Amino acid sequence: MKRGQRLERVVALAAEQENEAARILAQASRQIDEAVAQVEAMRRFRAEYCARLQREGGMNALQLNEYRAFLANLGKAIEEQEANLQRMRQEHAALQRSWRQLHCRHKGVGKIRQKIARQEQGVVEKRVQGELDDRAAARRRRRG
C-alpha cells in the first residue's frame, strides 16, 4: 500500500473529528441563543411586572412585601441565568478553539496527502517515461 493510500484513512479520520467538533460547536451556539432569549424574556417580564404595579397603584403592606420578595427572586433567577450564559459562552469559546485546531489539522494532513500523491505521481510518470524511452531506444537499435 502506498503512503498516499495510507494517509487517506488519516485524512478521513481528521475530517470526521472536525465535523463532529463543528456539530458540537453549532449545538452550543443554539443553546447560547436559547439562553439569551430566556434571559431577555425574564428581563421583559420583570419590567412589565414593575410597570403593571405602578399602573395599578397602591397596595397594602403584605402585598408590598410579597411584591418585593417576588422581584428579589426574579432578580436572583436572572442573575443565575446570566452566570449560566457566561459559562456557556466560555465553553463555546473553548469549543471554537478546539474546532479551529481540528480544522487546521485536517487541512494540514490533506496538504501532506496531496504532496505525497504528487510525488507518487511523479515517480510513476518518470518510470513510464523511462519505459517509453527504453522502448524507443530498442526500436532504434533494431532498425539501425
What residue spans do the PLM features occupy?
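Charge-rich amphipathic alpha-helical interaction elements
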Residues: 1-144
